């Protein structure tokens, strides 16, 4: 029997607030909690024999990119790895791949942010945002990804909007468009479309 890929699910920067409280401080929103779509996906994949990691960056909403990189450097990533990144986590994965030159099986970006997010005058800037988004993602990254890049978006996402469009020609990405998922908050309990894309 063929060995399953290992999967890394990476959260975003959790800038969202609920009743004035940062989402990152709500236990349900821990990426490993089975009550949200990321933890649910991890559980489903593990039941099917995948090795899955949902790493957590400490104080993520104010963490420098170097803290993300240090965490990613500790993970097992090889040509059988599937990387999944939400929002800023998607950008962090692309930047890290660009810097390390590692090859992976597949990359799935969910509501991906890009360096263009810093150009939005209406949003509150996160700490170290300019430094976080300092790397230019180029089309040469495609050579490090064996299968097609997949981007999952929701039509009603008000956080990154259409920012994903720059990645489509750059990475020859296929887009999966969903309805009523917003910015894929961890208040969403399941994301079967992601589970399906990982297993393809």
For the regions a protein language model found, what residue spans apply to each?
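Short, surface-exposed "cap/lid" segments of acyl-processing enzymes
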Residues: 2-47
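Catalytic histidine-centered segment of alpha/beta-hydrolase-like enzymes
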Residues: 63, 181-192
């Amino acid at each position: 029997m063929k060995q399953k890929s290992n999967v890394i699910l990476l959260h975003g920067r959790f800038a969202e607030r609920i009743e004035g409280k940062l989402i990152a401080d709500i236990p349900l929103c821990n990426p490993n909690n089975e009550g949200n779509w990321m933890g649910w996906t991890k559980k489903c994949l593990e039941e099917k024999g995948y090795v899955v990691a949902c790493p957590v960056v400490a104080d993520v909403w104010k963490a420098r990119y170097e803290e993300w990189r240090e965490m990613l450097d500790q993970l097992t990533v090889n040509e059988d790895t599937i990387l999944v990144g939400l929002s800023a986590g998607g950008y962090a994965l692309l930047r890290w791949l660009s810097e390390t030159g590692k090859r992976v099986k597949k990359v799935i970006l969910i509501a991906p942010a890009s360096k263009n997010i810093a150009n939005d005058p209406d949003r509150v800037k996160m700490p170290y945002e300019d430094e976080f988004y300092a790397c230019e993602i180029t089309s040469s990254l495609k050579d490090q990804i064996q299968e097609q890049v997949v981007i999952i978006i929701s039509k009603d996402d008000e956080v990154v909007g259409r920012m994903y469009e720059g990645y489509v020609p750059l990475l020859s990405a296929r887009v999966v468009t969903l309805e009523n998922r917003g910015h894929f908050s961890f208040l969403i309990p399941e994301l079967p479309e992601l589970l399906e894309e990982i297993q393809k």
